């Protein structure tokens, strides 16, 4: 077979590659040099490689164009990267315990974690930034916890989690997206697994009428659950439209099965579309129930005797769909086939007619179903009419034109596939710059590959993931960077750096540590001046200031068995002068950044002298920033 024929087969999806496949760098370099089908010289190869490196190089002292926010998967955190350099800037602990900052240990963080502080794990997949009029407003980032059915909110001005909500009466919050217009009023999140209601151990049959899962909406400001909608089948991924009326979610288990074979039995599953305005009307009219001890209004969105609910419509699509993505032009919900080589294009402007009963068949809203390759999982967009879909089995990203795919669905002979690019290996999510908004700029794309195999130095049986940066600014995709990541990012999101406004030091009136300020006020303490010990029966509260390189208290005395709370206020006013506090041999560690108040509580269970020290290098005399706790025997 000639090179020309091979290229043709790749574009039309006829060729089936091996697992490792051809080098993506080779393909990109050839394309960049204009030598498709030819032989590269040493000079042309070097020129292409140099061009790729120049694209992503951010010189010392210069700043990246974008903030990237990566989910940490079952590590439980959010990671902040600069794009295009792919340099890691910060880690934001959310559902995990972090000994550097004290997240999960400090009283402030445990107050935010609430009753779920007992969980030491999390599984976060989908980070999304709040919006106004379909554009990022940089106020919040939201993320799910599949492991313990939670949703968290991160304040982007301080890059700290400030609210965590447990979703009641469901299991495994997976897909998460935000209302885009007029602003992010709701955080929409899918509960993946079907459970009995009540889930009290008396019923285990998933076929039971009272076994179901629910679609959930969380108020973005209060972080209270606003409503839940019962659905047929299960829920996977979700997204919202650009009108504020519709959201949609994929279902891969319409069979309500619990085994692999059962979940793949049906040739078609569905996308369920929610009319959010109709849900709100049902609740306002009092047509809802509540479940168990929860006061959250629950609307039934299941079909009854073949008749649709007023709040949902079920659109059949090929089997076991996974990703659900809204095109940046607001025209389509794209459902990614997973076990089908296709993506289904749902025309959002036809949904009002579907809900009004003007269409004979729910499939009438499907206006395109392009065949793309094996294992399509997620789709992103460049704002120029092109979509980019990950092909998990083929280990590729495929670029295709949406309007041409729609024309092909009508029978026109048109090649909607523009390029297939090898990635390394088995990509899941992918994300283009600003692609969740109406401002998609078509510059960069990240393919989050699940396997790295031979791409990096070996690290034992556990390998890093591979997040690959792809230049999509031109007509041809070019792979420009491999980025190893620790387990296991699922998705990422990119915003322009001007859209994120961060504080340099803390505001003394910040609500993050308001409960600690209130406690100090009750004790008659001025946190910015006082260095005192308050004794309250068996409880001891130690208040101190800190200014590098010294604590306001260099020693304090307690009794064995006392519950000790140490409260420290960092009085430095220079950015980046963070202090730490570690009590040796007590499992105590926390960060106190400039103008922040932090506190931590522990039991002084060992008599004797115990040193505490500053764990952050805040000063040349950082080693001398110490103190001692003297514990008298009981």
UniProtKB/Swiss-Prot annotation:
Cu cation A1 binds at residues 579, 614, 618, 625. Homodimer. Pathway: Nitrogen metabolism; nitrate reduction (denitrification); dinitrogen from nitrate: step 4/4. It is found in: Periplasm. It is an enzyme of class 1 (oxidoreductase). One of its GO terms (biological process) is denitrification pathway. Pfam families: nos_propeller, nos_propeller_2. This is Nitrous-oxide reductase. Cu cation Z4 binds at residue 490. The lineage of its organism: Bacteria, Pseudomonadati, Pseudomonadota, Gammaproteobacteria, Pseudomonadales. InterPro entries: CcO_II-like_C, Copper_CuA, Cupredoxin, N2O_reductase_N, N2OR_C, NO_Rdtase, Nos_propeller, NOS_propeller_2. Cu cation Z2 binds at residues 125, 174. Binds 2 calcium ions per subunit. Binds 6 Cu cations per subunit. Each subunit contains 2 copper centers; Cu(A) (binuclear) and Cu(Z) (tetranuclear). Cu(Z) is thought to be the site of nitrous oxide reduction. Predicted to be exported by the Tat system. The position of the signal peptide cleavage has not been experimentally proven. GO terms for molecular function: calcium ion binding; copper ion binding; cytochrome-c oxidase activity; nitrous-oxide reductase activity. It comes from Pseudomonas aeruginosa. PANTHER family: CYTOCHROME C OXIDASE SUBUNIT II (PTHR42838), NITROUS-OXIDE REDUCTASE (PTHR42838:SF2). Its main location: periplasm.
